[in-house]
């Protein structure tokens, strides 16, 4: 009986536990690549808008000529809010896209950095907030892409002979699940990193 009490009182030996299984490491590295591509898309798209000296005029023509402005679920909002303030929304779009691109790229670099061992992959206190901001950026990227797709009158992908030599899924619609996937992954990282602190 005394031996049993002794074994209960003694702490269990500590074992070194790996941070993440190899499959999770690979999945996070792959998701960082997707996140980086999404970040580059938004960063370059925003910078292209800054480089266009006639962007406000071109944005106005784009919104006016889009099918979603005439019909669709966004038409009332576009007519009551966007068109009367077109210069504001054109400028806002430029800054939002550049901001999303930067945040998504920084988040991807951070996810990639953590895949390394040693000093480079060491945990830092800023990781949870970075993951949270990157998750919000992923959601914003998905929302912005969906808004553009609805504005353009994009439809769900189907078999169409006219799209034989182009992408089957319009790029704007393809960016929506990618943004959601990034948000999901980064939100998961945030939950784990927040608990670790």
Q: Where do the PLM segments sit?
A:
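Extended, low-polarity transmembrane helix blocks
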Residues: 2-197
